[in-house]
Amino acid sequence: MHYTIIDMEKDPRCGQFAYFRAMQYPFASVTVEVDITDMMTARGSRPFFLSLLYAVVRAANAVPQLRRRLLPDGRVAEYDWCAPSYTVMKPDGVYVYATVEGNLAYEEFVAEGQRRQKEVLERGTLTEDGNLRSFFFVSSVPWLHYTHAQNPMENPNDSNPRINWGKYVTANGRTTLPVTLTVHHALADGLHISRFYQKLEEELAELTRQWNESKKDF
């Protein structure tokens, strides 16, 4: 994946970058209840997980700071596009990882996601090839409506954002689910986390609009 090197000494966040880089646990994590009522009404038979994943990936890519990664030499790379590496459950209850590369339209994304999931389930091993540094690491816990999630991080230089979501519930006519975003605080702040959730709302609204205008179910 193509990336641009960011000169953090000239970046507006140069002070914050240096400050959080020195920490043993430089990560920030937020969980927000996201309203998916309109999406669920318009979804029809379209796959829920891949539909939400599509919106999440587009929202995360819309925030440049979430596409930034720490390189082994200490420099910061900003990728043009970051793909998801996400969990897929096998029949035995053990998960493997799948990826969907490229900035694809919705139907292409779903088709590629279904193809990749079939491949990784047949292969059965945990990991797959790809540029791990560029990925968003995504997982879901569809059995649990939680209030917060904490992700394992390999070391203080682990800069791949983690995105998780839990079980959706309906109350008072609205359907919501918890969505968690974990970032490296040297690369992103609360402003950028907030922008992700704003973009996610916009992407879900746009996807819902497209579905409502479409004359075909999936």
What are the functions of these language-model segments?
Residues K90-Y146:
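Helical lid/core segments from catalytic subdomains that handle acyl or acyl-like groups
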